[in-house]
Amino acid sequence: MKRKWLAALLAASLLLSLTGCGGGDSTESTSQTLSQSEQEVTQPVTSEPEYNEDADTIQTAPVKSGTIYISGDRGYSTYGFSESNTLEYCRTVSQAARELQGVATVYNIAVPLACGIDFSNAVQEEMGWSNQGEVCDFIYDHLTDGAVAVPIYDTLRQHKTEYLYFRTDHHWTALGAYYAYQQFCQAKGVEPKALEDYETMTFDNFLGSYYEDSGNNTALGNAPDTLVAYLPSSTNEMTFTDRNGTVTPWKVVYDATNYSRGAKYNCFIGGDQPYEEIHNPTLNDGSAVLVVKESFGNAFVPFLVDDYQDVYVVDYRYYNGSINDLCREKGIDDVIFCNNLNATGTPSRISDMQRIL
């Protein structure tokens, strides 16, 4: 769905047509000329119906508390678009797709932040925040070389009244990640597993990063999150390799009941480890997927376990290998870049991704 920022271009194109017939940081600009390859846009493979984007959104501006903003009992970080940085991210994902042609299909999931889903467009404009729907469109329109866009902004916006993001933490919930999994399956042309088919584990009294960043805001402290995790049915076993190279058996979803109140998000895939493997004993079809992620990908990975024989995960901030080599070594079919929008516009994160290609 193209948004306001494309309206002028579309109008101009229509005018020219009639005449011819006779009748994803602060916003930056870039003077770089896109290459021919970069202009060959990979269109999103899914489409979603039109809807009232501002329905059920927050209509009043949040207030500052510590380094974040508060609205009611919810915390929010901010988002600013950098065109030059985001273009570099698109080039990086497209480079991965180009180098893996004939080996694996590369998918990209750009995850909006909560402020871009919960607040009305008018409030976001008032706060000086970039429109994340427009940024997601920008990213998907600048993927090339066969990289496949998995659009999730509209889906999340349509489900905005559900528990998609934590109140006291900057991450999305497993439910938000599930909707991204559904969209990935649509992009891949397969049927997603129904949410009701998963068993769950629930961890109460989660007070995440926003609680600390707000200076222990009372409203947040009085509204701790409940974390619901969905367990794969095929296996809950995995291994991770830590930053010292030690391989440790672990759980895809670990019982975080006794974790500290701020660490419960680490129930997913052992937290932020450089490298992880999950092997599904119920499949023998050779299917394999690699997820290239930062911490937002942690809640997403468990939904892939039942669909592939092998699931590999790298956190590009800490991994020191080459995903190009890894795909060839492990026979990986699909590569999924899963990044929140702040990561897609942060030079250090983009450099980390480029380092492991």
Regions found by a protein language model. Name each.
Residues 1-19:
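Sec-dependent bacterial lipoprotein signal peptides
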Residues 21-357:
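Extracellular glycan-modifying ectodomains
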